[in-house]
UniProtKB/Swiss-Prot annotation:
Chain's role: Catalyzes the release of inorganic phosphate from 2',3'-cyclic nucleotides through consecutive 2',3'-phosphodiesterase and 3'- (or 2') nucleotidase activities. Also possesses a 5'-nucleotidase activity. Does not catalyze the release of inorganic phosphate from 3',5'-cyclic nucleotides. Probably plays a role in the cellular reprocessing of nucleotides present in the medium, under conditions of phosphate shortage.
Organism: Bacillus subtilis (strain 168)
Signal peptide: 1-35
Protein name: Trifunctional nucleotide phosphoesterase protein YfkN
Entry binding sites for a divalent metal cation 2: 97, 141, 249, 282
């Protein structure tokens, strides 16, 4: 009974409490749950590092006086900017060797030294570092080259700390700031600010005391790097450093080093505690890299040594080092939870300069250019260092000559005046770790300061040492360590050079003669350690023809680095120095050249490699060395190396450089050839120089051209080929064949060319144009029925090679070459009939069949057995021709612009050599053919080469004089008006490389039109970087067109699958953030992309125009013909997919001519527009509360640059289950409102699109909502509810119409569809205004937000009846009186497209934000309580509980009373 009463009592209590508890659950605020709040905060910190910049601020090679893409901080800074955009938590540091190393650094010392020391001027390089906002830096060994005063002044100008812990005063105190600890505010993964103390410490090799003895001795001392670290790092920890970064200007060895080591990174990582990251340098090497794979304690994948992340990012800004640290806070302090070191190359990743760098350094750069271009003298011979490591060399000879000249003057009145003077020099620029272009290559002629700096790279000073004969020999033994040991018994090819030996340590000593026996082991290794004490590689060491005595004394003039023992050379100690000078070696060289005025730096051959029989001593040098090897007796070119830009060469000795004389009956013929010059005459005078050189070297030679002299440059535009003809006559061509472009302007212009008729282009004949002084050979082109050309048709004829000939068109000719007959016949590609404009009367017969018949006639009728086919059918067809037609000895080809730089032979019973020399007169092809007495080619006695024609080739004076007349007149041609534009044509660099522009569209349209007409193309893709300027509204001149398209690129077509086209677009979009030039401007397709995704995953959709004009998704399996330019077609700008095309062809039409032709087609008046071909979209970030936000930094860039801002969602977003709530911050709204064009924001996915004009919104935090509320029985789409809120208030009506686009479920059910407003309360539909239908997408405009869907309007233009079973309520139909009609211009369609491809969905972000409708974001990672609201809720809850409690109490009392009464 008691239990029952107790249970009843409990039930009564629960009945009383339940209602208030339920009410409380509705009233009391429920805090959001964030799992991450309980976890330790994490920070992702990126350390960006540069090292060994060596004054290379600009991407400019001052020694060759031209821009380069290979190095320069101006390019590295683009990578820095990219990483800063990707991660706000970045530090930027420099690891030393910053201010010395090129003429810009030298200029600052020579002309700004006093101002820098006094502090009245900041070192220009430091100004750049300040502008880039470096966080810290350290000193490299070369910072000490200019003395301590200059270094102090340099440091003084830095806005960032420069630290060094191991350079001390003579009393043992730190000479520089040993370390700093800076507190950084970083953002953790939850978006919260965190304070992290970052410490920086720096080190430099102790060897600076030797290398810069004259600047440092008696002033400083240098502590061992590891000792210094262990002394200093505990202090940093004690002062609270959370993270310690070692800026270590020291290299990486693979094992522990002894105290005082030059390269101590391994020891820092293994012998110290507390370092979290190490920046390495000094060696100019790469880490992480494969070189260190498998070495104990090295992890190449993670870029760590002993678990500590390390980077060594090469030199000169070629790479950026990146160390990523994952920091976790535990027990109040930060620890490194994970780390990774990596390096990122500018090659392939950067295609433009950083404006911050260029703007800051520009004036110094210009001053440096003026400085290096100042002439100081002349050289009678070329000076290069291509073979400086294997033979005596002019680039070293001129330096040693100058040093000896200086020493003789300095020592003539000293006690040493009677001692013999020797001079030591080394090749500073010899490829190696610095690449295939890192060689001295100075042509004969003027010598400027830049050339002196190229010959002597460093700021060394002259010093003279006194040594004995045995010490001189050891010096040379040390140098001889450069060579590998060769085993004659092994035979074959053996590499001569030791890759571990630095070229600047290979000293040649002039004044003595000697040989190097490389069959013996080296006495010293690359560090100067004795490894074979009894070995002696130096043989026949003599002075003035007599063997050197070990005790004989010599003076050797060298530099301060070597005289102080630099490089580990034996015997070179300070007591051996008898003359120390402050004069730089470079200054001595300059003074020598100035005094001599003209120098002849020919090597005196005082040293050589001793001959080795039975083996080939091979080595690598630049491919640019090949022409010099071809002329040399002691070096031969073997072939291309696997290393880019390098060739393989071999030494030739007396016993193998002169092969056996040819067998009786062999006859040699040298055939020089060009093809596809396309009116590129700028280097024609240089071409003539090369031709004359070959003629002077050979006895039997002819000169041929394989066609396409026409079309491609202004010279043709102005003179229709007659300027080319003038130059060809001067050069003495023996024959040419027709290319397809010879027919571009029809028979009339070709007839003028064949007759020299200048009536059209030069009526007064000021240029004295004449007919060709050579015949045209054309066996398969029949012009006999063409009235303009038939008079030129001739029968086969014999001409004397090298003499003037009568013009005419012959099927073949015979050339009499010193009594030997050589037949030449011509072939032209058969598709010329459709790809050019020959007219209907000219017939192009089958090339192979014609060749068969022609060869037969030559052999049987002419009895000639030496036959050359001069063809314009393409390289692959040339190879096929050789296989199909017997009897051809040599094919000189054209059409495909192929560079054949090594012998290609097809054996068809007898061999046929196939050649082609690329394009535009860039090369002179040369084939040296050896025939036996039967006319059969002896390929083993024949040779093929291509001779480059570039700035290193002198211009023939006579040809130059003729050419200059044409060049001068072309300046007037450039002012010729070619059209008019009603709008400015946007070629702004920042636009054409990031988005669709009207100029990009116009160019792509012209390319597509021409390629469609000539080759059936359907698509055009061109690189935005090829558009170099815009054109203002008004008249368009030819000069402006050439400024837009200055490269003279030609039209190229390639057959690509849909998959490859998408890949091409991905390649074009891979480097947009850095201003890469590959950005694809297009015609014939539309594409959508986002930069939120990584390269390779940026293209979301590609559509192509179908034959009926619709835009349909591109089929990945179908093949399409794509038009582009020849640069992109060859894989340029990273478009490698074009090189994989199933078919590729250069149509030869030059870009600016296509541009002007497009103008003519449009009536010379144009107004191109941005049409929406290219759509860049922004992917929002989904927060944990389900809302979406826009990344502030990335969206700020996007909102400014995009043509139309789009926010793109996945296919399922906006559904009933996944409503969209996009929160746009106040600053983001402001950015959108400030846009000059189309200030709007469009949200879209596959099913819908909404475009909101910013005029409808105030500058405030905004929340935009889209949600599917299901579908109606009568609707053709879901019903969507659109909302927008600002400051917590819903905005119902708008000033400007909002565009809505919805996609239908089934287009088959559509009958006059339109978008309708759904008013559930009134059970009514209202049609939106200005509707349109595009396939299955329906668009309408409204001035208020509510629910909308697609309905059929029917034939009476009325909607169906409102379904009776649909719920009512919700929308009351009152939207502030807003109508559904847009006022003003109708916005463009903003519909989306296909669903987001895999891997491109917006990613979930970290950090939460507020719920509710205001759209304002709370603090990332959690919500602070709303105190006022909470207190109010608590008071209200208390009141309700009291009231309810009282009511329940009274109710229970009444019941009890009734029970008692009962």
């Amino acid at each position: 009974m008691r239990i029952q009463k107790r249970r009843t009592h409990v039930e009564n209590i629960l009945r009383i409490l339940l209602p208030p508890i339920m009410i409380l659950s509705l009233i009391l605020p429920t805090p959001p749950i964030h799992a991450e709040e309980s976890a330790a905060p994490q920070v992702h910190l990126s350390i960006l590092a540069t090292t060994d910049i060596h004054a290379n601020m600009m991407d400019y090679d001052y020694y060759s006086d031209k821009e380069t893409a290979d190095f320069g901080l101006a390019r590295t800074a683009q990578l820095i900017q990219k990483h800063r955009e990707q991660n706000p938590n970045t530090l930027l540091v420099d690891n030393g060797d910053l201010i010395q190393g090129n003429p810009l650094g030298e200029y600052a010392v020579k002309y700004q030294k006093d101002d820098i020391i006094s502090g009245t001027k900041t070192h220009p390089i430091i100004s750049v570092m300040n502008a880039l906002k470096y966080d810290a830096g350290t000193l490299g060994n070369h910072e000490f080259n200019y003395g301590l005063d200059f270094l102090d002044g340099t440091i003084k100008g830095a806005d960032f700390p420069i630290v060094n812990a191991n350079v001390k005063t003579t009393s043992g105190e730190n000479r520089y700031t040993p370390y700093v600890i800076n507190e950084k505010t970083l953002i953790d993964e939850n978006g919260n600010e965190q304070k992290v103390k970052v410490g920086y410490i720096g080190f430099v090799p102790p060897q600076i005391m030797t290398w810069d003895k004259k600047n440092l001795e008696g002033q400083v001392q240098v502590q061992d790097i590891v000792e210094s670290a262990n002394e200093t790092i505990p202090k940093m920890k004690a002062e609270g450093a959370d993270v310690i970064i070692a800026l270590a200007h020291t290299g990486i060895e693979k094992q522990a080093q002894s105290s005082g080591a030059e390269n101590a990174v391994f020891d820092l990582a293994t012998k110290t505690k507390g370092i979290d990251a190490i920046i390495s340098g000094h060696q100019h090497g790469l880490f992480p890299s494969a070189e260190y794979a498998g070495v104990a304690q090295f992890n190449v994948e993670k870029g760590t040594i002993n678990g500590i992340p390390v980077v060594m990012p090469s030199s000169w800004g070629k790479y950026l080092g990146v160390i990523d640290l994952k920091l976790e806070k535990a027990d109040g302090s930060w620890k490194v939870a994970d780390s990774k070191g990596s390096i990122e190359s500018i090659a392939g990743n950067v295609t433009s300069r950083n404006e911050t760098v260029t703007n800051t350094i520009q004036q110094t750069h210009q001053n440096t250019l003026e400085y290096v271009r100042k002439p100081v003298g002349k050289t009678e011979a070329d000076i290069n260092s291509f073979f400086a490591q294997v033979k005596d060399d002019p680039s070293i000879q001129i330096v040693t000559d100058a040093q000896k000249w200086y020493a003789e003057k300095e020592m003539k009145d000293t006690e040493y005046k009677n001692l013999p003077i020797l001079s030591a020099g080394a090749p500073f620029k010899a490829g190696g770790r610095n690449g295939a272009n890192y060689y001295t290559n100075i042509p004969a002629g003027d010598l400027a300061i830049k050339n002196v700096g190229d010959l002597y790279l460093y700021d060394n000073t002259v010093q003279i040492v006194k040594l004995t004969g045995s010490e001189v020999k050891d010096w040379l033994e040390m140098s001889a360590g450069q060579f590998n040991q060769i085993d004659p018994a092994k035979g074959g090819d053996q590499a001569l050079l030791n890759e571990n030996f630095r070229s600047y340590n290979f000293d040649v000593i002039d004044g003595v003669t000697y040989q190097v026996d490389v069959t013996k082991p080296a006495k010293y290794n690359e560090n100067g350690k004795v490894i074979n004490a009894d070995s002696s590689r130096i043989i026949n060491l003599s002075y003035e023809g007599k063997p050197i005595s070990p005790s004989q004394e010599f003076l050797v003039v060298t530099n301060n680095y070597r005289a102080s023992g630099g490089g580990g050379f034996p015997h070179l100690t300070s007591d051996k120095i008898v003359h120390g000078s402050a004069v730089e070696n470079r200054q001595v060289l300059m003074d020598y050249i100035i005094e001599q005025k003209t120098v002849n730096p020919k090597a005196d051959n005082n040293w050589s490699i001793a001959p080795v029989s039975g083996t080939n001593l091979t080595f690598e040098s630049s491919l640019l060395a090949k022409p010099f090897a071809d002329k040399a007796d002691d070096v031969a070119y073997v072939g291309k190396s696997a290393n880019e830009g390098y060739g393989v060469y071999k030494l030739q000795f007396d016993d193998d450089s002169n092969p056996d004389p040819p067998k009786d009956g062999l006859w040699d013929l040298t055939v020089m050839h060009t093809n596809d010059t396309h009116a590129h005459l700028d280097d024609a005078a240089r071409r003539m120089t090369k031709i004359n050189e070959v003629r002077s070297e050979t006895n039997h030679n002819i000169l041929l051209d394989a066609g396409d002299v026409f079309s491609g440059d202004l010279y043709f535009t102005k003179w229709n080929g007659l300027a080319d003809l003038k130059m060809m006559n001067m050069m003495g061509y023996d024959a040419m064949t027709f290319g397809n472009h010879e027919f571009d302007k029809g028979p009339t212009v070709l007839s003028d060319f064949l007759s020299g008729n200048s009536a059209t282009v030069d009526p007064a004949n000021r240029y004295h144009f004449e007919a060709p002084e050579f015949p045209i050979v054309s066996a398969n082109v029949d012009v006999s029925n063409e009235p303009k050309l038939k008079s030129f048709v001739k029968k086969p004829q014999t001409f004397t090679a090298g003499e003037k000939k009568e013009a005419g068109i012959h099927p073949y000719i015979l050339l009499d070459v010193d009594g030997e007959k050589v037949a030449v016949f011509g072939l032209t590609t058969e598709d010329t009939a459709t790809t050019s404009s020959p007219g209907k009367s000219i017939v192009f017969n089958d090339a192979f069949e014609t060749a068969q018949n022609t060869v037969k006639a030559i052999q049987e009728e002419e009895k000639v057995n030496k036959i050359i086919a001069l063809t314009h059918i393409g390289h692959n067809r040339d190879l096929e021709l050789a296989k199909k037609v017997k009897g051809i000895d040599l094919i000189i080809g054209g059409h495909t612009h192929t560079l054949v730089d090594k012998m290609e032979v097809v054996n068809n019973e007898e061999p046929t050599i196939v050649a082609q020399a690329k394009e535009y007169g860039q090369f002179l092809g040369r084939v040296d053919v050896a025939f036996d007495e039967k006319g059969v080619v002896q390929t083993d006695k024949s040779n093929l080469s291509v001779l480059p024609i570039d700035e290193h080739t002198e211009e023939n004076p006579e040809a130059k004089q003729e050419l200059d007349q044409f060049k001068n007149e072309l300046e007037d041609v450039k002012n010729e008006k070619v059209g008019y534009t009603d709008v400015a044509l946007d070629g702004q660099r920042e636009h054409v490389r990031t988005k669709e522009t009207n100029l990009g569209n116009f160019i792509a349209d012209g390319m597509l039109a021409k390629a469609k007409e000539a080759a059936g193309a359907r698509i055009a893709i061109t690189n935005g970087g090829g558009i170099r300027a815009g054109i203002d509204k008004g008249d368009i001149t030819l000069g402006e067109v050439l400024n837009v398209m200055p490269f003279g690129n030609t039209l190229y077509v390639a057959d690509l699958t849909g998959k490859q086209i998408k890949e091409a677009l991905e390649q074009g979009l891979s480097n947009v953030e850095n201003g890469g030039g590959a950005f694809p401007q297009v015609a014939g397709i539309e594409y959508t992309f986002t930069l939120n995704n990584k390269p390779g995953h940026r293209v979301l959709e590609v559509k192509i125009e179908s034959p009926n004009g619709d835009k349909v998704a591109i089929n990945t399996d179908d093949t399409y013909r794509v038009a582009t330019n020849n640069f992109v077609g060859a894989g340029g700008d990273g478009y490698s997919v074009f090189t994989e095309a199933s078919h590729g062809e250069d149509l030869g039409y030059v870009d600016y001519e296509i541009f002007t032709e497009q103008l003519k087609k449009l009536g010379n008046k144009v107004s191109p527009k941005v049409e929406g071909r290219i759509k860049e979209v922004f992917l929002p970030t989904k927060q944990k509360d389900g809302s979406w936000t826009l990344d502030e930094d990335k969206f700020a860039i996007y909102a400014k640059n995009a043509n139309t801002p789009f926010v793109y969602y996945g296919i399922h977003e906006g559904s009933q289950e996944k409503p969209i709530n996009l929160k746009v911050k106040k600053d983001q709204v402001k950015l959108l409102k400030e846009r000059e064009s189309d200030p709007s924001l469009t949200m879209f996915n596959y099913w819908y699109s909404m475009k909101m004009p910013m005029a409808n919104l105030k500058t405030a935090d905004t929340a935009i909502g889209i949600k599917s509320t299901g579908e109606l029985d009568v609707s053709l789409s879901d019903v969507y509810d659109f909302t927008v809120k600002q400051k917590g208030k819903e905005i119902k009506s708008f000033k400007e119409p909002v565009q809505l686009s919805l996609r239908m479920f089934d287009i088959e059910e559509a009958h006059n569809p339109a978008i309708y407003h759904v008013d559930r309360k009134k059970k009514a539909f209202t049609k939106t205004g200005h509707g349109s239908v595009d396939d299955d997408m329906v668009t309408g405009y409204t001035n208020h937000f509510s629910e909308y869907t697609i309905l059929n309007s029917g034939s009476n233009n009325k909607p169906p009846a409102f379904p009776s079973d649909q719920p009512t309520g919700g929308d009351d139909g009152n939207h502030g009186g807003g109508s559904d009609k847009p006022g003003g211009k109708q916005p463009t369609d903003g519909n989306g497209g296909n669903d987001t491809p895999p891997g491109t969905q917006p990613t979930n972000g970290s950090g939460g934000n507020g719920s509710g409708g205001s759209g304002t974001d709370g603090p990332a990672g959690g919500l602070l309580p709303d105190t006022a609201t909470s207190m109010y809720s608590i008071l209200l809850a208390g009141f309700l509980i009291s009231a309810l409690g009282t009511a329940m109490y009274l109710h229970q009392r009444r019941k009890q009373n009734r029970a008692n009464q009962a």
